Every structure is written in C-alpha cells, then in structure tokens.
Amino acid sequence: MNAIDSHLMVRDPAEPLARLRAQWGGRSDLWVFGYASLIWRPEFDAAEHRPALVHGWHRALRMRSRVNRGTPQQPGLVFALMPGGACRGVVYRMRRERADEELERLWAREMPTGVYDPRFLPCRTPDGVVPALAFTLSRRSDAYMGRLPDEQLLHILRHAHGRFGSTLDYMCHTAHALRQHGVRDREVERMMGLAARHGLIGQEPAARTAARSSTVSTSTSTPGSSTSAAHAG
C-alpha cells in the first residue's frame, strides 16, 4: 500500500516473505483476505472470491501514508487491520500454480517498506473456514496514527493527497466497495457521514437522516458510533 519511504522503512520485507512462503508451503491454493483497497483494486488474478469474516481483528483508518495517499509534509491515512473486534471483507483464492508469481506482485504492492505484519488468519466463509494471508498492523508501528479527533481527520480528508490520489477518495472507494459486497462498517459509515456533513462529498443517506433527526428534536441524544467490531477487514 505504501511506496518505498525511508520514514517507514522498519525492516527488510524479504524476511517475512520467506517465513510466509515456508508456512504456505506451495502445496495448495493461496487465500488472501482483502479489507480495503484489495476489495476494489486487487491487481491479481483470483480463481474465486467469497465474503469472509475474521474474528479478533478490525479495520481502522489509522495507518500513516506519506506517499500513496499523502506526502511527508501532509501525511494521509489508509486502512489497516488492527487487533480487536471483528472484520468482514473478501477472501480471494489464488491457484497454486500461479500463486507464487502473484504473491511476488502482491508483496511489491503491500510490503515494500515491511511495515505490515503479514499473517495467516482463519476466515469464515459461506463454504467453511479458510486460512488467508492478511496484512495486519501493530500498534507499536511508527506508521500507526492512533484514533484521531474528528477535526484532525477532517483536515487530512481535505488536504492529504499522494501519488495514487487523496485519502478522501481512498476512503470513499473503500466504503462503496464494502457496500457492494453487502458490508456496512459502522465506523466507515460514520466517517463518510462526517465528510458529507462538512461538504467534502455528496451527503450520504445516513447523514441526511441524522440531520433531519437533529432538527426535529434537540432533547433526544443520539447514541455514539460503535467501534468497527461489527464489520470488516
């Protein structure tokens, strides 16, 4: 997800690739779990894809991007798979005979800086559980931004733009792709509503509903948005 960037170079990405190949063994098809841009821009040939649920991890827009969706002067944000909760996404199956070649391409895209902690996670699908490669992020990583106040998030959505486009476009693409796959991520929807209310995108249906409700009664409190534990990865 990030291009080579000395600010984020934390380890040689060849080492986790060798470890993952040893775990996979090359004796079967390879599954990959998509939770953000891999859903709407996978860039590899998949023999099959399925909706999937991962427990123990959640999607969060908390990974710093200084190249693809931002700059060193104005870092952007991209989604990461963080510990805790649960996550709905899509698993893709690479055919064994092509998986090694496709894995090289995927690694060049996702792991040029070695910032992720790639691992196999059990993914529940309608046809059973499959072990799938997922790109996770540690809270100890220098790329981890933590939970940002809405004011800071809005500033990033307004101004962060990198070689592949803006953080705002990236978030919108992910939200729309999730909806197309029947996934409603409450935190993603909350951020989309926030962007809509501040005029950054066309107003979302949820944002319009919230706006109407707030004009009807000011005495009824609206429950706060929950964490992303009910959704996807």
Positions of PLM-derived features:
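A glycine-rich, hydrophobic/aromatic-adjacent loop/helix-cap motif
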Residues: 1-233
